[in-house]
Amino acid sequence: MLPDLTDIGTDPASTRVVVAMSGGVDSSVVAGLLARAGFDVVGVTLQLYDQGEAARRKGACCAGQDIYDARDVADRLGIPHYVLDYESRFREEVIERFADSYAAGFTPIPCVDCNRTVKFRDLLATAEDLGASVLATGHYVASRALPDGRRGLFRAAEENRDQSYFLYATTQAQATKLRFPLGGMRKSDVRALAAELGLPVADKPDSQDICFVPGGDYAEVVERLRPEAGEAGDIVHLDGRVLGRHRGVMHYTIGQRKGLGISTPEPLYVVAIDAARREVRVGPREALAVRSIGLTDINWLGDVPLLDACAAEQDIYVKVRSTRPPTPARLLRDADGAPTVELLAGEEGVAPGQACVFYDAASGAARLLGGGTIVRAERAGRHLAAAQVA
C-alpha cells in the first residue's frame, strides 16, 4: 500500500520537502515517492565521521559509499542534493557521549543520541533554512495528526522493522515538522518500489553496525577515547566473594552470562557495574528481575503533563530493549517526587544507559509517549544498579 502524502502538502509543486538521504533503500524510496508526486524535493546527506575508514566498510550506515549512493539516487531523480559536514557535531554529541557512557558502566544507545541531536535538531534547522515545510526520513515509524491538532508518533505496521524505540526522544515540536512516509509499509514493498522507481539501491543490504564502530568493535573506540574503561578490576559475587578479574567495565552489560572468564558451579550473570570501583558484580538469574525503574532525560509526548500522569498512576506499556515487546507498566512518583516506572510483570536484564520507552495503553501500545534513559533498577525494594549519566 502506497503512503498517503497529503499530510505533507496538498499542493505538491509549492511544497518543499527536505529528505534525509542516508544512501540506503528506505530514504531513497521516500525521495523517489515525493519527487514522483511532484513535491519540491531537496536531498541532504550528513557526513558524520572520517569517511576514509568508513568507505572501506560494509554494513554501516552513512559510510563513504553511502554518500555516493545518495548522490547517485538524487541525480537519477533530478533533485538537488547536498552533503553537510556534521563531523564535529557528531563527535561531540554522539561519539564522545557513547564513550563516556561505557566508561561510567552504562550500555548506551548512540542511535538515540544521533536522532535526537544531529539528525533531528540540527537537520530540522537546516531544513528550515532551506525553506522546507517538513523534513522526511526513511524511518519505520508512523506520524499522524491527533484530535487536538498535535502530531503523534506510532509504531510501524511491520513490527520487526519498527524504529519507534530509537525515536522516543523526538520532541513534540520536532514531530510537527517530521514526516515518515514508510511507517505503514512493509520492507518487501519498499524494495519493490525502489525497483519500480529505477533506483540503483533497490537491492542494497540494510545497515547493521553502529556507523562509527569499525567492524563492530565498539571496545576499540571506547578505549581509545576513554582508556580508563579498559582498566581491569574485580568480578564480585553479590555475597561479597571475589571470583576473578575482568578486562574493563566496557566489556560488560547487565544480563551478560558469556565471556565472564570465571568458572562456577551455577550460572552467573552480570547484575551491576560499579565503574568508580572498577567492579563487575554477578549473581544468579533471579537477581536480574526488576520491578521499578528510575529515569533521567525524560521526553514526554502524552496528553497531560508528565507529573499529572504520574500522580494519576497512569497505566502505560514500556520497552526496555529494542528487541523486546511492550510490557505493562505504570507511571508513579518516587519519594522525592520524581517520575518512576513500575513494571507490572517485571523484567530481566534492565541495563542503565538503555532506554525505557513509553507507549499508550489505551491504543494497545501503538502510540509512542516518549521515554527516558535508565539510571536505576530495583528488585522488590532491593537496589541493583544506579549511576549518574555523564
Curated annotation (Swiss-Prot):
Pfam families: tRNA_Me_trans, tRNA_Me_trans_C, tRNA_Me_trans_M
Keywords from the named record: ATP-binding, Cytoplasm, Disulfide bond, Nucleotide-binding, RNA-binding, Transferase, tRNA processing, tRNA-binding
EC number: 2.8.1.13
Region described as Interaction with tRNA: 161-163
Location in the cell: Cytoplasm
One of the GO biological process terms: tRNA wobble position uridine thiolation
GO MF annotations, alphabetized: ATP binding; tRNA binding; tRNA-uridine 2-sulfurtransferase activity
Protein known as: tRNA-specific 2-thiouridylase MnmA
Encoding gene (name): mnmA
